[in-house]
Structure formats: structure tokens, C-alpha cells
A protein has these predicted regions:
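Short, conserved active-site loops that position catalytic residues or coordinate cofactors/metal ions
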Residues: 33, 66-67, 71
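Structured non-transmembrane domains adjacent to transmembrane bundles in polytopic membrane proteins
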Residues: 46-65, 74-165, 383-586, 596, ...
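Short beta-strand segments
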Residues: 70-71, 126, 253
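A short N-terminal beta->alpha junction/helix N-cap motif
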Residues: 12-13, 40-44, 78
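Short coil/turn segments at secondary-structure boundaries
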Residues: 21, 68-69, 369-372, 419-422
Length: 731
């Protein structure tokens, strides 16, 4: 690190020119990135339900409807001549559109009662579109304005899975702009307060923006190779600004500290990179390692955050280790130009020093009280119920949300989210009695409104519609499928729907079958995630432990860090269950509680928050170890380390929390949860954990903090990471 610092100090301008070229290239690409990202990807593509759904689509051309059009007669019934003519004309016109592969309607199916509302004033048109999710969004951009609205005979409103995702995508893009407009001015004001100099304050923000632009460039390249979720943009903005500012705070603060101690500018740059730069590097490794655990999951939504998160950490680290020191080398003492007040070097009278001393005089009560507080906050997590997002993630006033609410309210079954049961190797003609018997048993299950099959439609075990020409769509040469329509009171992504899936899969049948559809996706997604979570947690814990051991040569310090992080995250998740699952702040935060927490959000927040927690752990312990090596006094080292880093860690936490808090303004409920949860995790970790629990436990462990068994000590002596100041002494 010292050689890197010396190189930067001697060649700052070429490095700055290279940065400008990189930013210019990224600036050209960045505006086009969102159009190449997908809004789906919440399901496990390797699951039984996903594979069965793919085969149903291949054999029968059937899938969850991308468009669901509610057609309402202005007066009377949808069976009146004017409404019927309008409905048939709409069906014919939509069928002729480019990219529309299948259209069915109440009228084209000969007055199929399930597609008519209870009062007879409304009917449904169901359409499937071809292509990827992005292709469907482009089609919907044209089709929705063309087909929704009112004419002389009917009113038409559009919803459907792809239409909901299209509206979610538009909302995310709008929210990103708003979050940036809210966060950046506040960040600049807080940075001015921290550094008391406009030049010093602008540098971390600049590094954050470079990290965001660089990551967008990488994301565009990744999106050309694989599917990437549009929600990765939220992480790119949040962590790009947050970590860029975070890392830069420590670098700028150390540089100013070296200048205040009388170092020449080149020496100050070299020492800063060798000390604070080393800390930033290994903090970035810890954060990236946590985010890499997301690659263990097959869900595109989660993998996308790794695609964005790992590059954004790398870009923030690169900016703080190369671009920022190059700027500091050019600015020199000019960094404090127009400074309101110079910040005095930290001594032994600061607030954090006194807090550390107070805690270490009573370590056991503080450790016990802090642990109890975190456990109490985490208690609601014991009742967590996990689900997948649906239209209710949109704000109540969103068009897609309003139309889907109308669908729930006025129709007898949830046609847009039917469960599909596939039986292959079955001849529907010769196996008609078996098909009929199975359809009857399906229709008797609790939570099922109706079952459509090649043998007819059944409600409560009774034949509702006899088999006719329309029923032939459920039959192929060696396969058949059943459409299990849920009761409108049973949400497709609910615990009740999970019970229906379990009941369906437990039914005896004269043939093998598989279940597809949104409810089965939920069950299989949870099962697949639960199978991988232990591996992901173990990966994060092991990599964190090894990284901290290589840095500090200790066994207890990494163990303490992992345990405290898990405790802190449990408290955060408990708070999220209380707020979002139970809906206690739904009025204040303007969202609709669904009684569940989005499964992917929990996994995502764990990986990100764990990494950010290690960020502050590395910053604090690096300075504590530096003081311990200099004095040999554990208690003094902890107090001085907390005093030297407490103000900066708190400022960094406040700044990154502002970035996440800005996401609460999003209209998407799980983005609100993402922002609030990460903000709470960061603030709690930087205050309660670092300010109270860490010094308390380090006091209780005493000199054992830095102990390791003899073989591991020899390993660390040989392979451990050491830093050197410009003068060559180990710190």
C-alpha cells in the first residue's frame, strides 16, 4: 500500500485524466442502462413450478396472462348487444396486434360465466404477449394507452402481471430521480458540517458519483450477457453514494490529520494510502464478500444485486484509493481553503473517549443491557411470514393496483393468478374418467373457487360447465392441464395460497403431475431459498472471520464481530416485521401491509447490512490495533481508537443512512423497507454496537482480544496483512 501511495503522490495528474475519461464514457452509457434491465426475476427458474410453467407454455401456449382487461358496460349487462359487439371487436382487434400470441374473452369463449363479474356489468379479456419481459413492456407501452379508456359502449381498464411489472419499473425510475434529488443536497450540507470546508466536503460526494457512474457502465455490460433486475439501480445509487462517501471520509480525515501533524503533502498522501487506504481496501473486501453470497441464489432479483453490489464496492474503493489521493496530492493544503474552522486533532478528552471509558468501567451491565435491547427489538422476527411481491407493492393510487383491486372485488375467482396443474404422459381422451375425477377432487379443496379441465369445469366437486370445444384447450396429444382458480379471498402470494398448493400436491392421482403458477412459485421459491440460506450465511461468516484474522491476528475479535453483527441484524429484521408485516406504520409510510415480508428483501438486507457492519468494524478495530501496538494497553487502545474513529464513523453512518432514508420516498413498498431497514441497521451498528457493545466486550476480553493459538499465530506472522507508514514502522 505504501508503494501505491508513493506512486499516486508522484503521478496524480495522469490518474485524474484517466478518471475523467472513464467518467465521460460512463456518462454516455448511464442513461441507457435502465432500458436493458428487467422488472421480474423474483422466482426460482430451477424450481418445479417454473419448469412446469415453461412446459405448459411450450405444449399449450398458456401462461399467466400478461394483460387482463376489465370491460364494463356503461349500462345494463355485458350480454347486451352493444357491450357484446364492443367486447368481440376488442378481442378481435387485440388478437391482430403484433406480439400478441393468445387472446381469450368472455365473449369469444361463448359467455364463459367465470369471466363475468358477479353483477354481470363487467367481463374479462385475457391476453398473452411474446418475448422477454422487456419486449412485453415495450408492447404494453403501445397497447395500454390504445385499449384502455372509455368509448360509447364500454369502459376498459388494464392490469395483469406484465402490466403490473411495467408500472413497477416506471415507478422505480421515477423514485430514483426523486431519491437523488432529496439525498444529494442533504449529503453536501452534512459533509460541509463534518469537514468545515467546501472543497473537502465536495471530494467524498464526487467519489460517490464516480462510483455510481462506473457501476452503471459495468451493469450495462453484464446486462448484455444475462438478465439483470432493474431494482439493482437502487443499490447502485444507494451504495455508490454511501460507500464512496464512507470510504472518502476516512481517507480525507487521515490526510488532514497527517497535514496537521506537519507532514509534507507527498508524505501525507503516502501515509494516508498506507493506513486509511489499507483499512478501506479490507473493508471493501468484507462488503464485497457479503454481497457475493447473493450469487448462491438462483433468483435473478438477488443475483442482480450482486452484479451491481460487487462492482459498486470495487468502484467506491478504487475511487477512494486512487482518484481521491490523486486529488489530495494536487490540492495539498488547498483542501482547507475557505475552511470555516480547522478541526483539532483528536485527543483524550473527546466525547467518544469519555463514552468508551464510561462503558469500560461497567462492561458487564452495558453488554447485558445492550444485548437485551437488541433481542427485544428482534423478537417480532420470530413471527415473520415470508412472501413474494404482487400488485400491492404499488401505491394505492397506481392504475394497475386500482384495477387489480377491482378484479378482486367484483369477480368470483382470481383468473389472473390461477394455479396450473400439468399431467404429462396422459391421453385426455382415453383417460377422461381419471381426468374428471381428479378435477372434481381439486375443486373440493378449501380456497379453490373453480377448476377448468379437459373434462369440463367444476365447482365444489360438481360439474359447472360440461366439456365442449373450449375444453379442448386443456388437452394435447400426451398431456393435459388443469386450471385451478383460487377464491378471490385467497391472495396468490399468501399463506392461504401456500396451503392450497400443499393440498394440491398431496392429492392422490392416477397419474404424475406438477404444479405451476404464482402460488407454487412462492412455495418453491421459499423452499429453494431456505436450502441455500445456511450456505450463504456460512460463506459470509467464514470470509469475514478469515479477513479479520488476516488483519488482526486474533480469534476472538472476528468471532465477536460476527456474533454482534448477527445480533444487530436480528434487531433490524424484528423492527421490519413490526413495521411492514404488521403494518404499524403503514399510514405514516403510505404502504399497504400484506401480512408478509418479501423473502428476497430479507436475504438481500442481510447480505448488505452484514457487509456494511463489517465496514465500520474494520475502521474501528484498525485504529484500536494501531493504538494497542503502540501502547500495549488494551483499555487505552479501545478508548483512543473509538475517539479517533467515533466522530467519522458516526458521520459516515449518518451520511449513508441519509442515502437509504431517501428511498423511503419510493412508491414501491419493498423499496421503502429496503431503505428504512438498511438505514436502521447502519445507525444502530454505528451507535449502539460500536459505541457500547464493542468497547464493553473488548474490555471483558482484555488482552485475549489479540490472542490466537500458536499455529495460527505463526500463520498470521507469515501471511497476515501488515501496513507500514511512510517511515516504515508497522502500525
Amino acid at each position: 500500500m505504501e508503494r501505491l501511495g508513493r506512486f499516486i503522490a508522484n503521478h496524480p495528474r495522469p490518474l485524474l485524466v484517466a478518471t475523467l475519461v472513464f467518467v465521460a464514457l460512463g456518462g454516455l452509457v448511464a442513461p441507457t442502462v435502465s432500458s436493458h434491465l428487467s422488472s421480474g426475476g423474483f422466482d426460482d427458474p430451477t424450481s418445479e413450478s417454473a419448469l412446469a410453467g415453461t412446459r405448459i407454455e411450450r405444449i399449450f401456449g398458456v401462461n399467466d396472462p400478461d394483460m387482463v382487461l376489465i370491460v364494463e358496460a356503461h349500462s345494463g349487462s355485458v350480454d347486451d348487444d352493444a357491450a357484446r359487439r364492443a367486447g368481440l371487436a376488442l378481442t378481435k382487434s387485440l388478437s391482430a396486434e403484433h406480439g400478441v400470441v393468445r387472446v381469450e374473452s368472455y365473449w369469444s369463449l361463448g359467455g364463459a360465466i367465470p369471466l363475468r363479474s358477479r353483477d354481470g356489468s363487467k367481463a374479462l379479456v385475457l391476453a398473452n404477449l411474446e418475448g422477454t419481459q422487456n419486449d412485453k413492456h415495450e408492447l404494453l407501452d403501445e397497447l395500454v394507452p390504445r385499449y384502455s379508456g372509455t368509448n360509447d359502449d364500454v369502459r376498459v381498464a388494464v392490469t395483469g402481471f406484465s402490466e403490473i411489472y411495467r408500472q413497477v419499473t416506471a415507478q422505480v425510475e421515477e423514485d430514483l430521480v426523486r431519491a437523488e434529488l432529496v439525498a444529494i443536497p442533504i449529503l453536501l450540507i452534512l459533509l460541509l458540517f463534518v469537514f468545515r470546508s467546501p472543497i473537502a466536503a465536495s471530494l467524498p460526494l464526487g467519489v460517490g458519483l464516480v462510483a455510481v457512474i462506473g457501476t452503471l457502465l459495468v451493469l450495462r455490460a453484464i446486462a448484455a450477457l444475462t438478465e439483470v433486475s432493474i431494482f439493482a439501480l437502487n443499490l447502485t445509487t444507494g451504495m455508490g453514494l454511501g460507500l464512496g462517501i464512507d470510504y472518502s471520509l476516512f481517507v480525507v480525515s487521515r490526510f488532514r490529520e497527517e497535514l496537521a501533524a506537519g507532514a509534507a503533502v507527498p508524505d501525507a498522501v503516502t501515509t494516508t494510502v498506507a493506513t486509511a487506504g489499507r483499512t478501506v481496501l479490507f473493508s471493501a473486501i468484507a462488503v464485497a464478500a457479503s454481497l457475493s453470497a447473493l450469487l448462491l441464489f438462483p433468483i435473478v432479483f438477488l443475483r442482480s444485486f450482486a452484479y451491481a453490489g460487487i462492482p459498486v464496492v470495487a468502484m467506491a474503493c478504487l475511487g477512494a484509493l486512487v482518484t481521491l489521493p490523486a486529488l489530495l496530492a494536487v490540492l495539498g493544503h488547498g483542501i482547507d481553503k475557505w475552511s470555516v474552522r480547522r478541526t483539532a486533532p483528536a485527543g483524550e478528552t473527546g466525547a467518544w473517549y469519555r463514552i468508551a471509558r464510561w462503558v469500560m468501567r461497567r462492561p458487564l451491565p452495558v453488554a447485558a443491557a445492550g444485548t437485551v435491547v437488541l433481542l427485544l427489538l428482534g423478537a417480532p422476527f420470530l413471527g415473520v411470514e415470508l412472501g413474494l411481491p404482487d400488485d400491492r407493492v404499488l401505491p394505492p393510487g397506481a392504475p394497475g393496483r386500482a384495477v387489480t383491486d377491482e378484479l378482486r372485488r367484483d369477480f368470483a375467482g382470481n383468473e389472473a393468478a390461477a394455479m396450473l396443474v400439468l399431467a404429462e404422459g396422459v391421453d385426455p381422451a382415453s383417460s377422461r374418467p381419471q381426468v374428471r375425477g381428479f378435477a372434481q377432487r381439486l375443486s373440493r379443496l378449501d380456497g379453490v373457487a373453480r377448476v377448468d379441465s379437459a373434462a369440463g369445469s367444476f365447482i365444489g366437486g360438481e360439474l359447472f360447465f360440461a366439456a365442449d370445444v373450449i375444453s379442448e384447450r386443456f388437452a394435447a396429444e400426451d398431456a393435459t392441464y388443469f386450471s385451478v382458480v383460487l377464491d378471490p379471498k385467497v391472495e396468490a402470494q399468501s399463506l392461504e395460497a401456500e396451503d392450497v398448493v400443499a393440498d394440491v400436491r398431496s392429492l392422490d392421482a392416477p397419474f404424475a403431475f406438477e404444479v405451476a403458477g404464482p402460488s407454487a412459485d412462492l412455495v418453491d421459491g421459499k423452499s429453494g431459498a431456505f436450502a441455500r440460506i445456511p450456505v450463504a450465511v456460512a460463506w459470509i461468516a467464514v470470509v469475514t472471520f478469515v479477513t479479520l484474522f488476516l488483519l488482526f491476528g486474533s480469534i476472538l475479535v472476528p468471532l465477536k464481530a460476527v456474533v454482534l453483527n448477527l445480533l444487530s441484524l436480528t434487531a433490524t429484521f424484528g423492527a421490519m416485521v413490526w413495521v411492514f408485516q404488521d403494518g404499524n406504520l403503514s399510514g405514516l409510510l403510505d404502504f399497504t401491509p400484506t401480512g408478509t415480508i418479501v423473502l428476497s428483501n430479507i436475504i438481500l438486507m442481510f447480505c448488505i447490512a452484514f457487509g456494511l457492519s463489517m465496514d465500520y468494524e474494520v475502521f474501528l478495530l484498525s485504529r484500536v490495533k494501531e493504538e494497542y501496538d503502540a501502547t500495549g494497553d488494551n483499555e487505552l487502545a479501545v478508548a483512543r481508537g473509538l475517539d479517533r474513529t467515533g466522530r467519522i464513523v458516526t458521520a459516515a453512518a449518518a451520511l449513508i443512512a441519509i442515502v437509504f432514508v431517501a428511498m423511503i420516498s419510493s412508491g414501491i413498498s419493498f423499496i421503502k423497507m429496503f431503505g428504512l431497514g438498511l438505514a436502521l441497521a447502519v445507525v444502530m451498528d454505528a451507535t449502539l454496537v460500536r459505541g457500547a457493545l464493542v468497547p464493553a466486550f473488548m474490555k471483558l476480553m482484555g488482552p485475549a482480544n489479540w490472542w490466537a493459538p500458536a499455529p495460527l499465530r505463526r500463520f498470521h506472522d507469515r501471511f497476515g496483512i501488515r501496513e507500514a507508514t511512510a517511515g516504515g514502522t508497522r502500525t
